[in-house]
Amino acid sequence: MKKELLAPAGDTEAGYAALYYGADAVYLGLKHFSARATAANFGADDLNEFVGYAHSLGRKVYVAVNTLLQEDELPELLKALDLCAKYKVDALIVQDLGVARVVREAYPELELHASTQMAVHNREGALALQKIGFSRVVLARELTLNEIREIAAIPGLETEAFIHGALCYSYSGLCMFSSLETGKSANRGKCLYPCRAAFGGCDGEKHYFSMKDMALQGEVLKMPVTSLKIEGRKKTALYVAAAVDYYRRILDGRGDDAERAENIRQIFSRPWTKFHFNGRNKDVIDRDFVGHRGLKIGRTGSLRNNSLQFRTTHKIARYDGIQIDVPGEEKPFGFSLQSLRVNGRNVFEAQAGETVEVKLPPHAPRLEKGWDIYLASASEVKGAYPYEKPKPGAFRQRRQLDVSVMIEKGKLSAATGEFFFAVTGEFAKAENPDKTADAVRKAFGKTGDTDFVLGNLTIENPQGLFAPASLLNELRRGLYGQVVFEEEPRVLPAVKKVRESGAPKWIVKTDKVETLAGINLE
């Protein structure tokens, strides 16, 4: 089974980069109802053109409408869903069961994918969602390969699993840390990531909840899922390009390219982990440092005259950025290589295995031998992932407008649907009626910045008359200026009131079966 490679797009640039480097599908958010509310996200015009371009390549676009909604947001939700239906997105990624119901009842043409925010972690949860209309479930990140296999075996249900990117300390969708600590809820797309902060503990101030990044690398070939998902709607187009390129090569059988993996580390990465893929793993926290680390390239050596010597395990160049782990500091010490020397000579770049001397900036802390050094950014990598994107407007999705034009003595008229326009004039016999028809096609082919393009054009000119271009253009402007597409309103069925009678009932919530032993269920 060919697996889908699914890439993130926090903006159009990341989306185009993902498609260029081989993503089979892209997931994105709109300006509202996205669990990554602080990403740039997509407006209506962005969505229109991006979906049009992706579909021209045979790729898919999924829109994340994956926050929990409040009742007064329903009108705004319907506007967002109208856009998704109008531009024919391939699926919606949903967390709120109320949103799922709206989609089922008013937008049945849109597929439903269950967001990882639903924390689907077993066969029963997946079956329950399949029963209410979800065609795909995005699995919780915390699963082992065997647990994934069990869910993926459900007939008729697609499965999607994360393979690379940031991890949440809690289960996605169930975490209240940001909400309770800052008033900004992750389930409203506004997580402030307090889990990345330092907290006091038995080992002093450490980042006890700061997770490493997932990177399954070649393990993805073992996964029996429909779709392999890269996290990162807040990442740059460069990061998305590098991650997609890396996993595309693995899936296409071109191998696990170490150099491309190193490129990802230089663009953005925390320490990598396979998480629980091969069994429960406790080494998933980076307690000492938070944020981007980069690619480890050596350890601090001798220090003299405000310069540092070390043996690099990777090619480096002037103006690259390096970071040094400083024990006791929350963040590594980073600086740009303004000078680079090898064997006492100034060089622009140094190769792996060479001992280099670099000038430290004036604000450098006191360094000691043996501290880890990371390549945090490299000019060579920044230029390694060019990508193409279409000209603005080239793939804008527009409706086809069928037009009929009548040329008769004393009058030109044009009609489309319920709209009609006419101009008067004196029209002589045409020397070549075919040229008149060409002129009509040319005039009415100019649809400009409208929501439509010319579809079928019917021309009636029974007397073989000549019509000047100026009048044809006036006729076109008059007709096109009237055209307004009325969208068929979506109607939500009234919610039936449920009346219950009888004795009060108890609701018991427990995670231990033994608790039920002491309750009379008769």
Give each language-model segment a name.
Residues 1-21, 25-35, 50-51, 57-67, ...:
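Surface-exposed amphipathic alpha-helical tracts and adjacent flexible/coil segments at the periphery
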Residues 39-48:
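Aromatic- and glycine-enriched glycan-recognition loops and surfaces
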